[in-house]
């Protein structure tokens, strides 16, 4: 009986955690993408809005900055432990 109670409590806590963490996201399909509401017909460079048209979405992708570690990998050295042996 104690085992069933413990398992049910663990299941409830896990479900609660999963539900609350998924609700924290606005839209799980927009990872790395930001959307701004822009009136349709707007020149995005001059920000001239025409209010009689419906709103559109302008999507801006966030580009990661900084050094790419894959470009700075040195070739394996024969004396190292990870060197492939024949």
From Swiss-Prot:
Modified residues annotated as Hydroxyproline in this record: 64, 67
Organism: Arabidopsis thaliana
Entry keyword annotation includes Transmembrane helix: no
Protein name as catalogued: CLAVATA3/ESR (CLE)-related protein 8
Superkingdom assignment: Eukaryota
Family: Belongs to the CLV3/ESR signal peptide family.
Gene Ontology cellular-component annotations: apoplast
Keywords: Developmental protein, Differentiation, Glycoprotein, Hydroxylation, Secreted, Signal
Signal peptide: 1-24
Disulfide bonds: none
Any GO BP: positive regulation of gene expression
A Gene Ontology molecular function term of the record: receptor serine/threonine kinase binding
Region annotation (Disordered) ranges: 43-86
Residues carrying a glycan: 67
């Amino acid at each position: 009986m104690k085992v069933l109670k413990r398992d049910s409590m663990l299941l409830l806590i896990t479900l609660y955690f999963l539900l609350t963490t998924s609700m924290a996201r606005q839209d799980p399909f927009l990872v790395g993408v930001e959307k701004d509401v822009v009136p349709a017909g707007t020149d995005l460079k001059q920000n001239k809005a025409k209010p009689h048209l419906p709103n559109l979405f302008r999507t801006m992708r966030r580009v990661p900055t900084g050094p790419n570690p894959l470009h700075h990998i040195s070739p394996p050295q024969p004396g190292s432990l990870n060197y492939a042996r024949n």
